[in-house]
Amino acid sequence: MILKRISILNYKNLEQVELNFSAKLNCFFGQNGMGKTNLLDAVYFLSFCKSAGNPIDSQNIRHEQDFFVIQGFYEAMDGTPEEIYCGMKRRSKKQFKRNKKEYSRLSDHIGFIPLVMVSPADSELIAGGSDERRRFMDVVISQYDKEYLDALIRYNKALVQRNTLLKSEQPIEEELFLVWEEMMAQAGEVVFRKREAFISEFIPIFQSFYSYISQDKEQVGLTYESHARNASLLEVLKESRVRDKIMGYSLRGIHKDELNMLLGDFPIKREGSQGQNKTYLVALKLAQFDFLKRTGSTVPLLLLDDIFDKLDASRVEQIVKLVAGDNFGQIFITDTNREHLDRILYKVGSDYKMFRVESGAINEMEEKER
C-alpha cells in the first residue's frame, strides 16, 4: 500500500496540510516541537483509527478549533485507489470511512493499511509495565489475524464484566461468574496460542536484525510467559476467584502475560546501555515490519521518528544501509539532524521527497534547496 497524498485540518498543531508523497522515501526536517511527529501521527491514525500518542480523540483537535479531519489517498499493490477519511467533532463520535462508506466497527479497518512506527515512545516497551509489551504483540498480530483481534475484544469485554462482579459487595452466584470465566477462557486460549506462535516465528527475525545493526556485538532474546501455559485457563480463573474477590480485580489470565526482553541471559531493562536499548527497539520494530510483510498481502508503511538518537556512528550507518535498501517499501522519516537524512538520500538516489517543518507548516523543498 502506498500513501499518495494526505490532507489534514486542525490535527494537533497542524492547521492545514496538503502533501503529495514519494512512493519510496519521504523525509521531514525541522527542530523539535514543530510538527514532524504530529504528521507521522496523522498517518498512523489512518491505519489504527487512533493516535499513537494520545488515545483521547478530542484532545488531538487543534486548540480553539471544533474538529479535525484527516484524509489519506492510497494506491493498493494492484493499482486500485483507496480513500480513507477520519473526522472528529468535539462532543461527537468520530467518523471513519473507506471510499466514503462508514465503518460499522472500527476493528474491521485494522490491518487494511498495515503500518509500523519506530518512535522515542518505544522506550516504554523496555522501561514500562507488561501492558506495553502485550500491546506490542497485539498491534502486530491484529494487523494480519482477524480471529486474534476478535478473540482479544471478547476476552477484554468478559474481563470487564468479571471485574465488576468481583467488586460487588452483594453475594454473586457461582453460575454468573462461570458465564464470564468460560468466555474469558475460550477467547483467552485463542489469544495465547496465537501469541505463542507469533513469538516463536518472530524471535529469529528479530535476532537477525539486531545482529546486523550491532555487527554481532551482543546476543538478544525474547521469552513469553502466560498463565495459560501448562494449565486450563478456566481452572486458573476458578482457582483464583477467592483471592480476586479480596483484591477486587482479576489477578490471573492472559491480560497478565509477559514478554521478557533479554540482553544475553538478563533483562535488558536492567543490563542495557542507552545505545543497546535503542538498538533493541529499532531491531524489534524492523523485525515487526519484516514479519508483517511476510504474513500479509501488502507491504506495510514504515514511519521512523527520530530513529538515530542515542546511537553511535557504526549503528547509525548499519540502519542507514537497511533503510536505503529495497526491503521496506514506502518510508516516512523525521530528524532534526539534516546530515542523517542526507546520508540516506545519498544511498537511495532520486526517488525521494524532502519536507521542511516549521511551526505546524509543512512544505516540500525545491530541488535547489535540498
Swiss-Prot record:
What family does the database annotate? Belongs to the RecF family.
Q: Cross-referenced SUPFAM superfamilies, in alphabetical order?
A: P-loop containing nucleoside triphosphate hydrolases
Kindly list the GO CC terms recorded for this protein: cytoplasm
Job of this protein: The RecF protein is involved in DNA metabolism; it is required for DNA replication and normal SOS inducibility. RecF binds preferentially to single-stranded, linear DNA. It also seems to bind ATP.
List the source organism.
Bacteroides fragilis (strain YCH46)
Q: What is this protein called?
A: DNA replication and repair protein RecF
> Which GO terms are recorded in the biological process aspect for this UniProt protein?
DNA replication; DNA synthesis involved in DNA repair; double-strand break repair; SOS response
Localization (cell): Cytoplasm
Q: Which GO terms describe its molecular function?
A: ATP binding; single-stranded DNA binding
Q: Which residues bind ATP?
A: G30, Q31, N32, G33, M34, G35, K36, T37
Question: Looking at the record's lineage, which domain of life comes first?
Answer: Bacteria
Keywords carried by this UniProt record: ATP-binding, Cytoplasm, DNA damage, DNA repair, DNA replication, DNA-binding, Nucleotide-binding, SOS response
- Coiled coil ranges (UniProt) are none
Q: Could you tell me which PANTHER family the record lists for this protein? A: DNA REPLICATION AND REPAIR PROTEIN RECF
